[in-house]
């Protein structure tokens, strides 16, 4: 893959201002290291700087390794499309939909795909009634990644506290029915689905700490 970049001017976009900035910085170190090992000297662009796009003059391809809002949600891709710079990853619409858990689940359900019961939390939501129906639930910011602002709740007081916490990441909050069972992740590279990997944690769920600061 790196050989296919021969003769191209490359930039790696990373950092940004989302809650996942530190994750992006770690990912960028890996990507930049691999490119350097392949004989390339990519332009390194931290998108936290103002008007970062002004640094991309002469760049042919951008590797977008940002995480979270502004980076994964189609915003960066829209800027690059406007500049005529090729970019790794999905297009604007695909990125925006994939970053929005509510819209993603609505699409899956519309396509007839099985997905856990869910609702968008509103001021009128009866937390106790939701838990009576589901038993327990996960509360998530609709447009955040890395499990930031996420909580597993089983009583109305915890539900209310989790909603307040999730809203610090954005107004839209998703409540999703808890399914007790093994968890798997599957990466998609182009049109190829890679082997499924089972996720196991010592306690709780696969939260930010487990993802980036433990042996899970």
Listing of model-derived features with the role each one plays in the protein:
Residues 1-93, 97-110, 122-129:
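ATP-binding N-terminal substructure of ATP-dependent carboxylate-amine bond-forming enzymes
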Residues 85, 144, 211-213:
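Short connector loops/turns at beta-strand edges and beta->alpha or beta->beta junctions
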Residues 154-216:
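Phosphate-binding site of ATP-dependent enzymes
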Residues 1-14, 42, 56, 97-182:
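Active-site nucleotide/adenylate-binding loops and adjacent lid/helix of ATP-dependent enzymes
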Residues 38, 83, 133-134, 169, ...:
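Structured helix-beta-strand junction loops
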Residues 68, 147, 202-205:
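Glycine-rich phosphate/pyrophosphate-binding beta-alpha loops
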């Amino acid at each position: 893959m790196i050989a296919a970049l021969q003769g191209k001017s490359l930039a790696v976009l990373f950092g940004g201002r989302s809650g996942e900035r530190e994750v992006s910085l770690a990912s960028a170190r890996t990507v930049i290291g691999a490119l350097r090992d392949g004989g390339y000297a990519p332009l390194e662009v931290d998108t936290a700087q103002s008007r970062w796009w002004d640094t991309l003059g002469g760049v042919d391809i951008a590797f977008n390794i940002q995480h979270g809002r502004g980076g994964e949600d189609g915003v960066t891709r829209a800027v690059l499309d406007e500049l005529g710079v090729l970019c790794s990853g999905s297009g604007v619409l695909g990125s925006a939909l994939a970053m929005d858990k509510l819209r993603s689940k609505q699409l899956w359900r519309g396509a007839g795909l099985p997905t856990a019961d869910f609702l968008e939390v509103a001021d009128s939501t009866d937390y106790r009634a939701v838990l009576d129906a589901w038993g327990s639930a996960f509360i998530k910011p609709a447009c955040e990644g890395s499990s930031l602002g996420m909580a597993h709740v089983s009583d109305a007081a915890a539900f209310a506290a989790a909603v307040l916490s999730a809203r610090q990441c954005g107004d839209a909050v998703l409540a999703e029915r808890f399914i007790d069972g093994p968890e798997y992740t599957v990466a998609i590279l182009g049109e190829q689905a890679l082997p499924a990997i089972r996720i196991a944690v010592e306690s709780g769920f696969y939260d930010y700490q487990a993802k980036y600061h433990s042996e899970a």
